[in-house]
Every structure is written in structure tokens, then in C-alpha cells.
A protein has these predicted regions:
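Outer membrane beta-barrel
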Residues: 16, 34-222, 227-271, 367-405, ...
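Outer-membrane beta-barrel pore domains
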Residues: 21-22, 43, 115, 265, ...
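Short linear proline/tyrosine/threonine-rich motifs used for host-factor recruitment
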Residues: 12-23, 27-31, 37, 320, ...
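Extracellular/lumenal/periplasmic "stalk" regions immediately C-terminal to a signal peptide or transmembrane helix
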Residues: 1-4, 8, 17
Length: 502
């Protein structure tokens, strides 16, 4: 969070030089004892903060019973290595810029956040620039606060490692408040929505403006938005989406508990850019996910690009003069539902999400979907904090941090079950379900050791309705049709991680 200047309260209201709000909660000026309006203190209109995070993961696998090429890699690597600057300028504007030097989530771009936010109106903000698109309770939450080393399968497939990074250029508006029932019990809510396009330099089918297919364009060279080379050389327009999320906590009492509900949805127009011979140049759409792993991010489920090359429709004198699409995704509609709660040391959460694919070669039955259920308990008695402004979990502060020998920090045990199904009538993306057990040690609010044991219960990448897409080829490649090689495998994965932010 940005360190707010001292002239502004937590709810955004300006303060005078003594720290008193100059307007009430309805925006009406507050008068001093002489009947004059209190004046804001503008002596500290600017703030600056520099910070970052270092996250290191390790992975050991037991899955040597599969075909050649399906073994997951053991190893150690940086999950994230970020540095950021943020603050407030001219009293009413918040800024943030963050760069990830590791960017090990399936993307190559380094920029995560790069935005300007207007915060002058209490409980309201407008953000312009690259920002989190705002889908899912788990994805809106900072990865500094995650219970598990990796987010759930559907979250990873649809949002985190989807066809477009969740950090997208756009404009969003948000509001938050609470229905105060008494001094201790309130019903906080959030509403956020806007228009987003694509990420800065995002690779893959989700980026219609770069040569994500690695093909040569008609100008004789390759084009990638990641290097910002000649966007007009047949690179295509950017896609766009309308997205929104709303949350309500029917029960919330700080340091006691919360009951959270939420829904979100989006509609994205997908661009498909073709060469003159009907082959796909850029664009399209695809979903994929690894089995809750990071060091080895092989995609065990993968739809492949849902747009394919066109076929010849009209031939004149042996030359094709017109083409027609066979498989072409034109738009994707997504929906998600959230339910979470915490009381005392126990916390639970569940999410469901789906993506409806529409276009040539697809029907109303082509809906990809997944869900996750997770829960945990703090053995040292802490209650999981709730962020009322974002409608998600907040940073845990141990009752007794492991500092100077005065305490042992906080200990947490947790479990999760998740499932992702991307097999439909016309899509053979595969299905997978896993279980995860976790033990976390929070030494301080900003230093944490994590260990997860992941078991893959089943993988089914052989859809009989489209058998060709599920066949096993050698060597197995997670990004191609060879995902069929993973069918029937049930590996165990041990992961360990260190999380530090400052």
C-alpha cells in the first residue's frame, strides 16, 4: 500500500494541520469553533516509497512412470524478483510502477504495474495504465499473502497464465464502503469495473498485436509488440475486454472474522489476424495450466490456439481467391463466483469460474470451467485479516514475530482441492484435479517459509470426440497436442518456497 500523505485519512478525506478531517463522510465541510471551514494541510502533497519482493521456489517430483519426456524437472528458481516505486503527487494522484526481473509465470514482460490513480473523491478511485484486471478473489489478492505457493488450477489457467497477462492496459473505476451496523460490526462492499486491452509485450495468442505465432509477416520480417517494432506491419489491432467485480461481506468484525461473497464477469473481443494464404498470423486465444508447479511449468492441460488457419473456399484457375474459417474464436465471456470466511484461527474459501468460447466451429456447449476449495488454521491463534477496500485477504501479522528471540512467529496448516476441465464437444484441452497440503511459517509480517505437497489425482487429455488432439507424441511438449502423454499420470510434487517483501 502507498504511504498516504498525512493530510489525507484512510478513507481519502483531506486533513488539516492537526490531523482532523476537513469534510464529513458525506463530503460536507466541517467548521471550526468560529464557524469557518477547516482548511486542508497541503504541506505534504507528495510521498515516495521504494520497495520490492524476492520469492524463491524449489521443486522435487515423483512422476517417473510416464512416457519419455513427461518427467517434471527438479530444481530451484526465482518465482518473482520485483522492485517498485509508488506514492502520491499533487495530493490527489497515486502512482505505481513495478518491474519483475524474474517474471516466471508464463510471461516475458517485466512491467507489472504502471498506472496513475485519481484518489481525490472519498471511497472512489479511477485508475489509468497497466494494472491488475480485477478478476477473482485469489488473483486480486497480492501474491505476498497467498496460503499456497501457487494459485489454484482455474485461476492459473484463466487468469495468471492465460492467453493474456492479468496486468493489462486500461481504465477502471472502483468504489468501496461499508454498511455500518454498529461500532464493531459492518458490511463492507466493493465495486470495480472498466475497459482493458492487452499487456505490455505479452506473448502468446492473447496478444493479437505481436507475432506470437513466430511466423514471418508479408513485409518479410517478424513483428513483436514485446520489442515495439513497427506495429503497423500487419500486426493487427489489440483486443479489448469489459470487466467488472463486486463483493459484499454480510459479516465483518475486525480481528474476529468475516463472511465474504463476490461475483465477477468479463467479455473480451478476440482479434484474429491472417496471412494472405489463410494461415493465422497473430491473435486467437488459448488456455493452459501446469499442475500447481512453478520450477517446471510444463502445461499438463492446454487447449492450443482456439483459432486455426482458414481453408480455401473459392478457387479460380487453380488459385485460391477466398478463404473461410474452420475454427475461429471471436469472443470469450467469463464468469466467476466467490465465497470465503474466517472466524478465529480458521479460514475457508471457494471459487468457481468458467469461460464460454464463441465463434466459428464452436457452440454453446464449449464452456471451460474449474473450481477450488481451500481452508486453513493458524496454530498460533491469528485471525486472517480482510482487506475491505479490495474485497480479499490482507497481510497476516503474527501475534509474536520471530525477532530478537521474543516469539516464534505464526504457524499455519492448510489444504486445497481444485479441478480444471477444458474438454468440451469441440475443444480437447484436457482436465486435471489436484490436492495440496501446506505448512507455512510466518517469521514476521514480511518473511515467510512455505512448503506444499501436491498430489495429482487424475489427468484426462484424451477426449474421444476429438481423439487426434489427445494422442501422445514424442517427446512430450506441454504446449502442443502431446498433452495426451500426461493422461493417466498421478505424480506427487514437493515444493518449498521463501517469501520476502520490503
Amino acid at each position: 500500500m502507498v504511504d498516504k500523505p498525512k493530510h489525507r485519512a484512510a478513507d481519502g478525506r483531506a486533513l488539516d494541520d492537526k490531523g482532523n478531517p476537513v469534510v464529513d463522510e458525506k463530503g460536507k465541510p466541517i467548521l471550526d469553533k468560529n464557524g469557518n471551514p477547516l482548511k486542508p494541510d497541503y504541506t505534504k502533497d507528495f510521498s515516495f516509497k521504494l520497495g520490492g519482493r524476492i520469492q524463491v521456489d524449489s521443486q522435487i517430483n515423483w512422476n517417473g512412470n510416464g512416457p519419455y519426456g513427461t518427467d517434471l524437472a527438479n530444481g530451484v528458481g526465482f518465482r518473482r524478483a520485483r522492485i517498485y516505486t509508488e506514492g502520491v503527487m499533487f495530493r490527489d494522484y497515486e502512482y505505481r510502477f513495478e518491474y519483475d526481473w524474474a517474471r516466471n509465470n508464463g510471461g516475458t514482460q517485466g512491467i507489472t504495474d504502471a498506472y496513475l490513480k485519481y484518489i481525490a473523491i472519498p471511497n472512489f478511485a479511477v485508475t489509468v495504465g497497466q494494472q491488475n484486471e480485477g478478476k477473482s478473489m485469489e488473483s486480486v489478492m497480492s501474491n505476498n499473502y497467498l496460503t499456497f505457493i501457487e494459485r489454484s488450477l482455474p485461476n492459473n489457467a484463466f487468469i495468471e497464465a492465460g492467453p493474456n497477462s492479468k496486468y493489462q492496459i486500461g481504465i477502471t473505476a472502483e468504489t468501496w464502503n461499508k454498511f455500518a451496523l454498529d461500532k464493531d460490526w459492518a458490511m463492507p462492499y466493493t465495486v470495480r469495473g472498466g475497459l482493458t486491452t492487452e499487456s505490455v509485450g505479452a506473448p502468446g495468442p492473447g496478444n493479437s498485436s505481436g507475432n506470437s505465432q513466430g511466423q514471418t509477416n508479408n513485409a518479410g520480417g517478424t513483428n513483436s509488440n514485446g520489442t515495439n517494432i513497427n506495429r503497423n506491419a500487419f500486426s493487427g489491432d489489440t483486443s479489448y475486454q469489459v470487466v467488472g467485480r463486486g463483493t459484499l461481506a454480510p459479516f465483518y468484525q475486525k480481528d474476529v472474522g468475516v463472511l465474504h461473497t463476490g461475483v465477477w464477469g468479463s467479455w473480451r473481443s478476440v482479434n484474429n489476424n491472417y496471412n494472405t494464404d489463410g494461415t493465422l498470423r497473430t491473435g486467437g486465444w488459448a488456455y493452459q495450466s501446469a499442475p500447481n508447479t512453478d520450477v517446471d511449468r510444463t502445461n499438463w492441460i492446454n487447449t492450443g490456439n482456439l483459432s486455426s488457419a482458414k481453408v480455401c473456399a473459392v478457387t479460380i484457375k487453380g488459385t485460391c481467391t477466398a478463404y473461410k474459417p474452420v475454427k475461429q474464436v471471436n469472443n470469450v465471456a467469463m464468469f466467476g463466483a466467490e465465497l470465503a470466511g474466517a472466524y478465529g484461527p480458521v479460514h475457508l474459501s471457494a471459487e468457481y469460474m468458467q469461460a464460454q468460447i464463441a465463434g466459428y466451429g464452436y457452440s454453446g456447449s464449449d464452456t471451460l470451467q474449474g473450481f477450488s476449495v481451500q481452508g486453513g488454521v493458524f496454530l498460533t491463534g491469528e485471525t486472517r485479516p480482510y482487506d475491505v477496500k479490495k474485497g480479499t485477504w490482507d497481510r497476516l501479522v503474527p501475534n509474536n514475530s520471530f525477532v530478537g528471540g521474543s516469539g516464534w512467529g505464526a504457524f499455519e496448516i492448510a489444504g486445497r482441492y481444485d479441478l480444471m476441465d477444458m474438454n468440451t464437444l469441440h475443444i480437447n484441452g484436457g482436465s486435471i484435479n489436484t490436492g495440496t497440503l501446506a505448512v507455512n511459517w510466518y517469521l514476521t509480517p514480511r518473511i515467510r517459509f512455505m512448503t506444499d505437497w501436491v498430489h495429482v489425482f487424475s489427468v484426462n487429455n484424451n477426449n474421444s470426440l476429438r481423439a487426434a488432439g489427445g494422442k501422445c507424441a514424442f517427446p512430450a511438449q506441454g504446449s502442443g497436442a502431446a498433452i495426451g502423454c500426461f493422461s493417466g499420470l498421478s505424480p506427487d510434487i514437493w515444493e518449498m518456497a521463501v517469501r520476502l517483501d520490503y
